[in-house]
Curated annotation (Swiss-Prot):
Gene: rpmI
InterPro entries: Ribosomal_bL35, Ribosomal_bL35-like, Ribosomal_bL35_CS, Ribosomal_bL35_sf
GO cellular component: cytosolic large ribosomal subunit
PROSITE patterns documented for this protein: RIBOSOMAL_L35
Pfam families: Ribosomal_L35p
Any one Gene Ontology molecular-function term assigned to this protein's record: structural constituent of ribosome
SUPFAM superfamilies: L35p-like
Family note: Belongs to the bacterial ribosomal protein bL35 family.
Name of protein: Large ribosomal subunit protein bL35
Length: 65
C-alpha cells in the first residue's frame, strides 16, 4: 500500500508540539495595519493554537509530522 501524501500547504503553516497539539500563526497582520490598534497587532504576533475540532483534520493532512 502506498504512503499517504502530506498536504504541503498545511505543513508550511502548522507545527506540532510535544503534547501533540498544533500551533500556528495569526492572520490579519500582512497589510492594512494603520487602522489596527498597537495592542491588537502585538497580540497577533503571538503563536495561536488550533482548536480540538480542527486538530483531527490536521492529523489526516499531516500524517508524518
Amino acid at each position: 500500500m502506498p504512503k499517504i501524501k502530506t498536504n504541503r500547504a498545511a505543513a508550511k503553516r502548522f507545527r506540532k508540539t510535544a503534547s501533540g497539539k498544533y500551533k500556528c500563526g495569526h492572520a490579519n497582520r500582512s497589510h492594512i495595519l494603520t487602522k489596527k490598534a498597537t495592542k491588537r497587532k502585538r497580540n497577533l504576533r503571538q503563536t495561536g493554537h488550533v482548536r480540538a475540532e480542527d486538530a483531527g483534520r490536521l492529523d489526516r493532512m499531516l500524517p508524518y509530522l
